[in-house]
């Protein structure tokens, strides 16, 4: 079996791991895939700014300073730098490293490139038709992205979706496969028993459904723990903060390596999402710990949760029906939740799928 030489990248503007308090799932996935392929004997170069720390054979920074470090912050916080300019700077930092990847690939140093911000790499991939480029799509495919992907389409560019639902806005892209995000099962150990609280974990934003989770807790008189990076603004001030009390508690940001303690003892994790989420790691993390999920029927939810076996899917997205599901959550066998993740959403299964797809197309 050929051992491929691979270059991969997520972002050039901040380091891997991300800054403290930052949740950025694509980075976790990229690191897991890279480290897993190295363990299988592949050569993987991970591109990122100085300070990037990943257990791969080589980190390539090409002298680039991270924008979340003092030297980089001086650029983004300089005179006449507004939000639009900051985004341009981010893009150029990414493109600097992407250009380096293509230069090395042209020299024959890589068999393929695996890039996680596809829109920033498209022009270079389009102009280098002999270099195989794989993109993992982490975000929804918005109409403007569909247009751009079409503009720069070429046979050497392959898209990896993280759910079948993610493909719906752009079914005709050159998809290599759907590969579900995997999690480290050792980091999310199983608990057969639970305490008496519901759980919400994620960004504290409207699309994640925090306000709906709060209302479910009030409707059912259940205790709710809320975990996520602190936010400010009208949404928090009007829809969340007024309801915080001894039963509805905001815990704050919890590092990913400590989340299992909260998942394990929850009676259920609430996921009343308000958007077509391509893949929800909260779903798999919760079930790995044995905790069933109660979720609205949006995005990838029906691909991840088995309705009636590993949780409940609220098909018409009604709060009352979610509240009713809370009352029957003990019908779910927690061991079934764990088994489902072991069989379908482990890191090892994800790594094996990437290896399979890369070898099938490039070899």
PLM segments and residue spans:
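Short hydrophobic beta-strand element within catalytic cores of glycosyltransferases
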Residues: 292-295, 305
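A short, well-ordered alpha-helix in the C-terminal region of glycosyltransferases
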Residues: 321, 328-356, 360
């Amino acid at each position: 079996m050929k051992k491929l030489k691979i270059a991969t990248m997520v972002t050039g503007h901040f380091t891997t791991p991300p800054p403290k308090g930052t949740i950025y799932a694509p980075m976790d996935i990229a690191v897991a895939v890279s480290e897993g392929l190295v363990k299988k004997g592949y050569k993987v170069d991970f591109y990122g700014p100085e300070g990037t720390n990943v257990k791969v054979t080589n980190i390539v920074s090409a002298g680039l300073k991270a924008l979340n470090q003092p030297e980089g912050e001086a650029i983004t916080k300089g005179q006449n730098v507004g939000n639009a300019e900051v985004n341009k700077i981010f893009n150029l930092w990414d493109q600097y490293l992407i250009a380096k990847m293509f230069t090395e690939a042209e020299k024959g140093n890589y068999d393929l490139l695996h890039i996680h911000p596809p829109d920033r790499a498209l022009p270079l991939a389009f102009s280098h038709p002999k270099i195989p480029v794989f993109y993992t799509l982490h975000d929804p495919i918005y109409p403007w992205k569909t247009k751009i992907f079409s503009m720069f389409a070429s046979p050497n560019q392959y898209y990896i979706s993280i759910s079948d639902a993610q493909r719906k806005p752009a079914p005709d892209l050159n998809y290599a496969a759907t590969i579900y995000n995997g999690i480290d099962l050792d980091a999310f150990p199983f608990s057969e028993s639970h305490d008496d609280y519901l759980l919400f974990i994620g960004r504290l934003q409207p699309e994640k459904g925090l306000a709906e989770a709060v209302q479910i807790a009030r409707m059912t008189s259940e205790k709710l723990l809320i975990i996520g990076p602190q936010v400010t603004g009208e949404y928090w001030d009007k829809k969340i903060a007024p309801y915080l009390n001894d039963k509805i508690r905001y815990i704050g940001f919890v590092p990913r390596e400590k989340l299992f303690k909260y998942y394990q003892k929850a009676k259920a994790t609430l996921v009343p999402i308000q958007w077509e989420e391509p893949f929800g790691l909260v779903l798999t993390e919760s079930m790995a710990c044995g905790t069933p999920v109660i979720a609205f029927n949006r995005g990838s939810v029906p691909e991840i949760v088995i309705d009636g076996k590993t949780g409940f899917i609220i098909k018409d997205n009604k709060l009352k029906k979610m509240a009713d599901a809370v009352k029957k959550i003990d019908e779910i066998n927690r061991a079934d939740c764990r088994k489902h993740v072991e069989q379908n959403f482990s890191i090892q299964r994800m790594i094996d799928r990437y290896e399979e797809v890369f070898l099938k197309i490039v070899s």
